[in-house]
Amino acid sequence: MSSNKNQSDLNIPTNSASLKQKQRQQLGIKSEIGASTSDVYDPQVASYLSAGDSPSQFANTALHHSNSVSYSASAAAAAAELQHRAELQRRQQQLQQQELQHQQEQLQQYRQAQAQAQAQAQAQAQAQREHQQLQHAYQQQQQLHQLGQLSQQLAQPHLSQHEHVRDALTTDEFDTNEDLRSRYIENEIVKTFNSKAELVHFVKNELGPEERCKIVINSSKPKAVYFQCERSGSFRTTVKDATKRQRIAYTKRNKCAYRLVANLYPNEKDQKRKNKPDEPGHNEENSRISEMWVLRMINPQHNHAPDPINKKKRQKTSRTLVEKPINKPHHHHLLQQEQQQQQQQQQQQQQQQQQQQQQQHNANSQAQQQAAQLQQQMQQQLQASGLPTTPNYSELLGQLGQLSQQQSQQQQLHHIPQQRQRTQSQQSQQQPQQTPHGLDQPDAAVIAAIEASAAAAVASQGSPNVTAAAVAALQHTQGNEHDAQQQQDRGGNNGGAIDSNVDPSLDPNVDPNVQAHDHSHGLRNSYGKRSGFL
């Protein structure tokens, strides 16, 4: 076989087809060798295997013999490498298993935590449901308890008339703070009647004692009758005299809201018979008997305490008008004492007022007498001085007399001369200002002349004159005040024009009376000189 193979290899192809086939075979062998070499990891083994591709067969055999020694070493290295790889794979598998186990443990823990949370939520929801159920049950119990209390409260007024009478006979005491309430509830039908007379009789004689109040008719109509409590404030009465209608019981009416109503409900047969009045069985008596009055409660609540059943009824003849307190002597005595005390106080006040008026009258009369005396003395002094008098001086003396009168009431007469002398000494040191005077005010020169004449008269008589000193001081003070007012008026006018009614020949700084006197003596040009020294 080997010989045949060698022979086939040694055969040289002649044609192109055989050459191509030969190349294809060589290429296939090389590809197989390359694939086998690529599978081996050791480079020495790969180089050894690839050495067979050399073109020379003899070179390949030589290389095979040269590397046979190192083949065992490379095989051992390859085995160690494979073992190392196997160890790495085993470790990698262990790590993967550990990671997978860890993930499974985490997942299990998460599932356990989720299950615990769900259990807690379920427990909380269960607890909430139980709590709500307990609350609902408690509320139902409270509602039942309240309903029981309400039923008891409603059942308490539903007592029979005999029990009311028995309680009233055993004890007459009742709670005055608790308002009366009917045993019938609102809109409840009390009873039905066949006639209006039966209705009124029942309300007056039976329902009133049961309700422990007096029920009266508020208004009566053909198809409705309205009842109310006696204390509601207004109801019909048979007494026509207004003076007799007012009585003590009227003060007890406090607008009670207790109301009843009775309505007339005709039967259906009656309505049909009205349409056919010619029937033989129809008559008015049967229609009256067939009517039905229904008594119904509107407001069962009173605003006052119940009246005792066994109280004494007052006769109608004993009712009197409410005009004055009856049988109250103590109260009348107290009123008389208060009136007497008030009268005494008024009398005392009147006496005090009369005394004060008398004192004032006496003081005024004394002051007027003193003023008259002062005025007479001043007139005598002026006449003795020989100066011309004017009506303005009398007014000035009257004012001075009033001022001296007020000061004489406040101070004693023996202190006045010292004070007046001090004021005169202080005022004499001050220089008087030059101010224009009107027709009603005296000139400062005239006042100075009066003071000088008064001083001369005092010196000639040799006795102190109190009135002269007072007049001089008061005149000087009034002159200063008047000057200040005129200066303010002049400052406000800012030097306005002179009045056209005033004579231009008159000097505004000198008294007109003095100027007229000087004109009569021919002293017209001396005003400017005199005005500078005033």
Swiss-Prot record:
Knocked-out gene: effects: Induces filamentous growth and leads to decreased HWP1 expression.
Composition-biased stretches (Basic and acidic residues): 267-285
A single GO molecular function term of this UniProt record: telomeric DNA binding
Region (Disordered): 1-36, 262-285, 353-372, 402-439, 477-534
GO cellular component, one term: chromosome, telomeric region
Inducers of expression: Expression is increased in during infection. Expression is also regulated by CDC28, SKO1, and SSK1.
Record-given protein name: Transcription factor RBF1
Gene this chain is encoded by: RBF1
